[in-house]
């Protein structure tokens, strides 16, 4: 998720779909010898982090709505803050 303007829920969900498609493409590239396993793992790790950040942002926005807050106040948090979240 880029810095600057805050994405809407629908933009965040679209980004999630794009990341999932990228993940599938990477797996196909590996199967067909287009990339090495280490390249695939490195890219998958980046995608996993971005997905965690996207889902965290959506959870923040939902929580703010449910408590009468402004969902636009939600922010993309650093990877080390959202990794392993099990909400």
Swiss-Prot record:
InterPro entries in alphabetical order: Uncharacterised_Rv0898c (IPR020311)
One Pfam family hit: DUF2630
Start and end residues of each stretch annotated as Disordered: 67-87
Protein name: Uncharacterized protein Mb0922c
Lineage, opening ranks: Bacteria, Bacillati, Actinomycetota, Actinomycetes, Mycobacteriales
């Amino acid at each position: 998720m880029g810095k600057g303007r805050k994405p809407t829920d629908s933009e965040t969900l679209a980004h999630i779909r794009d990341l999932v498609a990228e993940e599938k493409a990477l797996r196909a590239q590996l199967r067909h010898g287009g990339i090495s396993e280490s390249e695939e793992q490195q890219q998958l790790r980046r995608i996993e982090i971005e997905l965690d950040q996207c889902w965290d942002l959506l959870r923040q926005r939902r929580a703010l709505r449910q408590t009468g807050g402004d969902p636009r106040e939600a922010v993309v948090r650093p990877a080390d803050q959202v990794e392993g979240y099990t909400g």
